[in-house]
């Protein structure tokens, strides 16, 4: 059984490494999904494939879906891949995967991305995705301190940036966390919000979150 698993892992890695076209990449990703393997070597090979094909949205989307499926085993490899690569396109897909997973190990990175100054629309979108990841972490983690830190960072995102999309994402995340502290943050910010879309979303969130 061990030998068979080892051979299967080698085959999966080989298929990932040899995938030169988007069609081949999608087949290799499907094989990983079907195998449900959580071996680090296979996950690392999948990340390498994502780094090569991240500009093909269908391939990148499929890879992210599998990386989310393989969590929590995929979290550490995703974090390591982000730190070791400077390609912003590849990093954006990593952030999307980590935000969808919502593992507390990714909190510091997601918080860092939320606070990053942006030079273009794509980078701004990554910040919004990271903010949504903080909402998922803050609403599911059992550590109260982590939840409080998530609310603190989302509060910053709500009142500091000029990016209305980031503020909107922060509102949705605070509603997801849904604690009295989240309600207090939204309540204090709603009067000063200049964008009517964001302000309307704040009011909707406040109706759904308990004040105490």
Swiss-Prot record:
Molecular function via GO: lyase activity; oxidoreductase activity
Domain of life, per lineage: Bacteria
Annotated organism of origin: Mastigocladus laminosus
Alphabetic keyword roster: Antenna complex, Lyase, Phycobilisome
Annotated InterPro entries: ARM-like (IPR011989), ARM-type_fold (IPR016024), Armadillo (IPR000225), PBS_lyase_HEAT (IPR004155)
Family: Belongs to the CpcE/RpcE/PecE family.
Presence of the UniProt keyword Lyase in the record: yes
Function: An enzyme involved in the biosynthesis of bilin.
Name of the protein: Bilin biosynthesis protein PecF
Pfam families: HEAT_2
Keyword Transmembrane: no
Gene name, Swiss-Prot/TrEMBL: pecF
GO cellular component entries: phycobilisome
């Amino acid at each position: 059984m061990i030998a068979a698993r080892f051979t299967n892992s080698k085959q999966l890695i080989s298929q990932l490494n040899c995938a030169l076209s988007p069609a081949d990449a999608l087949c290799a990703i499907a094989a990983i999904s079907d195998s449900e393997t959580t071996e680090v070597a296979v996950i690392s090979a999948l990340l390498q494939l994502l780094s090569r094909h991240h500009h093909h949205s269908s391939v990148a989307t499929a890879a992210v879906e599998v990386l989310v499926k393989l969590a929590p085993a995929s979290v550490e490899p995703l974090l390591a891949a982000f730190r070791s690569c400077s390609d912003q396109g590849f990093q954006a897909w990593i952030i999307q995967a980590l935000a969808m997973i919502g593992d507390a190990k990714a909190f510091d990175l997601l918080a860092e991305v939320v606070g990053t100054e942006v030079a273009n629309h794509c980078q701004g979108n990554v910040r919004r995705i990271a903010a949504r990841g903080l909402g998922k972490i803050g609403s599911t983690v059992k550590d109260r301190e982590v939840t409080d830190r998530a609310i603190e960072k989302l509060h910053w995102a709500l009142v500091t940036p000029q990016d209305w999309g980031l503020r909107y994402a922060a509102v949705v995340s605070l509603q997801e966390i849904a604690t009295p502290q989240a309600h207090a943050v939204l309540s204090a910010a709603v009067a000063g919000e200049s964008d009517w879309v964001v302000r309307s979303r704040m009011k909707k969130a406040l109706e759904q979150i308990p004040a105490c």
